[in-house]
Regions:
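Structured recognition/catalytic domains enriched at protein termini
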Residues: 1-130, 136-166
Length: 166
């Protein structure tokens, strides 16, 4: 059976539980000077059976899923850039950790779930940005795209204009 065949009976959905609101530009030269996005984006993964729409928890193993963050302006995303252009934008705008592995945690209702936390993600330029979070399933040596979600736009300020952490 091909690696992708097992996923044809599943629905993958990412939801953003904590949207980024603002950030201070990052010089990306000193650890203390990183303008971390605030609040840290937190995502939750839901996997359901295609037939029954029931949650599938055995698939929520930490070593199976990864989410990659792509930072760009809303205008950049509307243009549907090629992967090469997106990579160039990452070098221009992003710093910090761009990927997050799945963490099995409990939500605010004490229910176990699959979460991705971006506690060290920063932006190097001022302006309005969005983050595209892309979910991949690791199947052997392959990364299989499963879902994606976009953050709300957020503003990145210069250090002088930054209103502070929320």
């Amino acid at each position: 059976m091909p690696a992708d065949a097992a996923a044809s009976d599943r629905i993958h959905r990412l939801t953003i539980l904590q949207q980024p609101k603002s950030a201070r530009t990052s010089a990306c030269t000193a650890k203390a000077d990183q303008g971390i996005i605030d609040p840290s984006p937190i995502l939750q993964l839901h996997v359901q059976s295609l037939q029954t729409r029931q949650p599938i928890l055995p698939y929520l193993q930490p070593s199976i899923y990864i989410v990659y963050a792509t930072i760009a302006t809303p205008h950049d995303f509307r243009k549907s850039p090629s992967p090469a252009v997106l990579l160039a934008l990452q070098h221009k705008y992003a710093s910090g950790l761009l990927s997050s592995g799945l963490m099995r945690l409990k939500d605010t209702n004490n229910v176990e779930g699959a979460f991705f936390v971006y506690a060290n993600l920063a932006v190097k330029a001022q302006g309005t940005f969005m983050i595209k979070f892309s979910l991949f399933e690791i199947a052997g040596i392959n990364l299989l795209p499963r879902a994606h979600v976009y953050s709300d736009p957020f503003v990145v300020y210069s250090p002088k204009l930054f209103p502070g952490l929320s």
